[in-house]
Amino acid sequence: MQKKFPLNPGEALGMMGGGQLGRMFAIEAAYMGYHVTVLEPGELPPAAEVSLHHIARPYLSEEGLDALAADTAAVSTEFENVPAQALDRLAQNVFVAPPGSAVAVAQDRNREKHFIESVAHVPVAPHCRISAQSDIEAVEDSLFPAILKTARLGYDGKGQVLVDSRQDLARAFESLHGVDCILEKRLKLFKEVSVIVA
């Protein structure tokens, strides 16, 4: 759904997720004159403490999503693991940024790498997909030392294992229960940059 911009102070903004980032968003939005409604399954998440309304429903609850859309002029998400289909449903009735299609890419490290390389044409660390034990034998030796990362639901070091050899890789993949992964060559970092575009 299209929304005329800018949004005027006094309008309500929706936030999918009620953690610390949602809390910071709600505080800054209040300073700018906006009201925030948070949809978060938890009973008293950090963002709810500083928001006008808290909808305590699962992210895929039709009732919760419809209430959020009805109460707000625009909706965003505080993290990439909100179900993309929830954002797609919201977008039928309210402006949503980022869209569900972008979040779906950000939720999967393999899709994200492919997008960054082939669409954005930005160089990335050497990598390969590991989705089965048979993929381990095909890994080039030049990829080691590396980091094995779960393709989904990993953040802040969770779902990541340092590996120095094919044997380490096999053990690490097994320890991650054989879920879809990405193996990235370990590189020396000189700088890390985080960018948010509004």
Give the predicted meaning of each segment.
Residues 1-107, 111-114:
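ATP-binding N-terminal substructure of ATP-dependent carboxylate-amine bond-forming enzymes
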Residues 107-194, 198:
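Active-site nucleotide/adenylate-binding loops and adjacent lid/helix of ATP-dependent enzymes
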